[in-house]
Amino acid sequence: MVVHIAVIGTETAHVIEWLRSGSIEKIYLLHSKKTAEIDFPKKARELDKQIKKLYPGVEIIKRVIENAFNLDDTQDAISEIFYNERENGVENQEITINITGGTAIQSAAAAIAFVPPVTLILMSSFAT
């Protein structure tokens, strides 16, 4: 089983593009709490619906990151997911993390959470 972990922010299209690159059975969507400016839980729910429409039967788990500007909060959430999945028999190479969404701090936390045990998907808006 491949387990996907995606940090999301104001934009979520990158997650759909990423999922097109391979099989999907389970995805964790990590997002911030609702702010005065942006309803991140709503964005996660909307993305959940899009993913389920494209990939019926996929298991989607949404997790709130308490502080999107604190490195430890994102690292702790990813570490917990990683260890829970490992206990369920998922191998290191079956866990992928998309670090292209969320705040810069969340992306950095995701990048350093489990390098090299997991595969990092790096996407660049500068790619042609």
Model-found features: residue ranges?
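Conformationally flexible catalytic loops at phosphate/diphosphate-handling active centers
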Residues: I97
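Long, low-complexity, Lys/Arg-enriched
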Residues: M1-E94, I105-T128
